[in-house]
């Protein structure tokens, strides 16, 4: 790591989160280093002035100014699991990714991560991961080594006039639940298909990115108050967020192994392939029912460990076959 004073430090990677393209580094230094305080991205307002700091085109410590153009922006055409960005018109180009988005009080309210462009250069819009999400990821990586994701357990669509007419409801704002996932917090609390989520705690919910953005700041086991509408009647209910037990990696749909599988194979770690959509792995003899034990020589305890893997550094995977044999796949 090189500072503005051109001093170089050795850093240790504490952890990373590929879904937001963030990592935590521990810098080895005998001196106190300057730092920026976290701001509250939740209270940042549209129209508020912000500064974007980065190194575009290797132009070190470049600062550009703009305003917040939108919040909870959903970039569903991009390969990103995070779908709740701050949109600004501050000039951001190649090399700005990972730079700070700062408010006029000198507080961090986001980490610059993407631009909207057909040319690869800045054309008016840039996007940042909100600081409240960044802070939670930072704390999770230090404490747990991976990101703890608290899930409500619903899917659906943002309500609009067309859906309101179709489902015969007297409102056009909110998140319309299309599916309640069995075994998750929403189902256990009593939420149903057709319910319209209006708020989670004190946060208004109009889009899926509103919902995922707020829940990205929560951990499994935490409780949230869900305000919803059912049959045109407003209700409130407390939901306990659950830990995800499924993920997708290299075309494999993976889930945590259960107690019975752990006992049968004498394992204390691993995730099992429920579906396989990767023909290359299939040609290597990998199939549904195989248990993924290690990635890059590191034990995989659960799907959260899989989500923390940096795809670009992938070197090897160890599988356990249903017959008890182990197989290692090497990636070059």
Regions found by a protein language model. Give the residues of each.
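Solvent-exposed segments in extracellular or luminal domains encompassing
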Residues: 214, 307-310
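Short, surface-exposed beta-strand/loop "edge" segments at domain boundaries and coil↔beta transitions
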Residues: 280-283, 324-329
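Edge beta-strands of extracellular beta-sandwich domains
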Residues: 237-240, 327-332
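Serine-dependent protease modules
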Residues: 1-189, 199-223, 229-248, 255-260, ...
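Intrinsically disordered, low-complexity Ser/Thr/Pro-rich linkers and terminal regions
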Residues: 7, 298-301, 321-323
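C-terminal structural cap/anchor segments
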Residues: 236, 241, 245-276, 281-282, ...
């Amino acid at each position: 790591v090189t500072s503005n004073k051109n001093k170089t430090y050795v850093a240790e990677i504490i952890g990373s989160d590929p879904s937001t393209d963030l990592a935590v580094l521990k810098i080895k230094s005998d001196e106190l280093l300057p730092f920026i305080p976290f701001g509250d991205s939740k209270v940042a307002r549209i129209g508020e002035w912000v500064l974007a700091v980065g190194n575009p085109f290797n132009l070190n410590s470049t600062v550009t100014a703009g305003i917040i153009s939108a919040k909870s922006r959903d970039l569903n055409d991009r390969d990103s699991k995070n779908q709740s960005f701050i949109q600004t018109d501050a000039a951001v180009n190649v090399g700005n990714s990972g730079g700070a988005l700062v408010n006029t009080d000198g507080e961090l309210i986001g980490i610059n991560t993407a631009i909207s462009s057909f040319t690869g250069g800045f054309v008016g819009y840039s996007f940042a991961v909100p600081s409240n999400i960044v802070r939670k990821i930072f704390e999770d990586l230090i404490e747990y080594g991976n990101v703890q994701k608290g899930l409500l357990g619903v899917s659906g669509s943002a309500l609009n006039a067309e859906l309101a007419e179709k489902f015969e409801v007297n409102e056009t704002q909110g998140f319309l639940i299309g599916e309640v996932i069995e075994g998750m917090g929403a189902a256990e609390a009593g939420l149903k298909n057709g319910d319209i989520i209006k708020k989670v705690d004190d946060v208004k919910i109009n889009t899926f990115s509103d919902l995922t953005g707020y829940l990205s700041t929560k951990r499994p086991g935490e409780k949230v108050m869900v305000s919803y509408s059912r049959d045109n009647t407003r209700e409130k209910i407390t939901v306990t967020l659950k830990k995800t037990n499924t993920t997708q990696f290299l075309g494999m749909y993976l889930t945590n192994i259960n107690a019975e599988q752990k006992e049968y194979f004498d394992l204390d770690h691993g995730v099992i392939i429920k579906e396989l959509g990767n023909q290359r792995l299939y040609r290597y003899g990998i199939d549904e029912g195989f248990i993924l034990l290690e990635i890059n020589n590191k034990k995989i305890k659960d799907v959260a460990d899989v989500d923390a893997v940096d795809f670009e550094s992938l070197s090897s995977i160890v599988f356990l076959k249903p017959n008890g044999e182990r197989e290692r796949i090497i990636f070059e």
